[in-house]
């Protein structure tokens, strides 16, 4: 059973990947898209020679051309999913699109995008200057949010990718994680440290 985050965190998108054991030619898929695009509302792009991007049935697929120099299965990404059942349904829809029969295909979750809220106004400039944390990056000329990186004591594997953008409203955008337990632990750490810093800043903010 997949772990579910607390009500503080909402999964807004899942990027997953799967492999086709029966490869399909990109030109064939393009022809299928042309045949079905008006009827099924398919939108597709082939701007790079080895990548075909397709929007279909509420999902986005990125199909990679199989190399002629390898026997490995053909790789495909799927996004715009909110839960695991979305991924399963999306894969079956893709099999229909490429004219292959339904089958169970394993998938890997590569990345979650989540939203969260600390529930209060956060003076991010003061939090940054007060905390002096090595995990905080504040560049207001680039983005109006405090960037918070995941510390290695929460996830050694995701310390370079899992991050949170914290806005003054208290809203958070969390990306780069592939494990909901780690994302929950990361957000809990952010919440406790930022709120604690805000409490020490209360006299300054009120003066």
Functional labels for PLM-detected ranges:
Residues 1-165, 169-173, 177-207:
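Intrinsically disordered, low-complexity polar/charged tails and linkers
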């Amino acid at each position: 059973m997949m772990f579910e985050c607390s009500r503080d965190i909402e999964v807004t998108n899942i990027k997953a990947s799967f492999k086709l054991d029966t490869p399909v030619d990109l030109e064939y898929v393009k022809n299928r898209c042309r045949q079905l695009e008006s009827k099924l509302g398919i939108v597709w792009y082939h701007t790079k020679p080895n990548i075909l991007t397709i929007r279909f049935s509420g999902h986005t697929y990125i199909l990679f051309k199989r190399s002629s120099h390898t026997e490995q299965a053909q790789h495909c990404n799927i996004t715009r999913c909110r839960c695991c059942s979305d991924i399963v349904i999306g894969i079956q829809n893709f099999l229909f699109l490429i004219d292959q029969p339904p089958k169970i295909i394993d998938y890997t979750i590569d990345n979650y995008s989540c939203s969260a809220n600390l529930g209060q106004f956060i003076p991010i400039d003061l939090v940054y200057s007060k905390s002096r944390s090595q995990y905080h990056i504040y560049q207001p000329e680039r983005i109006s949010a405090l960037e918070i990186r995941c510390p290695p004591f929460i996830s050694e594997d995701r310390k370079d990718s899992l991050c949170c953008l914290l806005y003054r409203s208290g809203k958070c955008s969390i990306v780069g994680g592939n494990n909901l337990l780690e994302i929950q632990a990361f957000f809990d750490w952010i919440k406790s440290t930022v709120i604690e810093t805000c409490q020490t800043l209360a006299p300054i903010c009120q003066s």
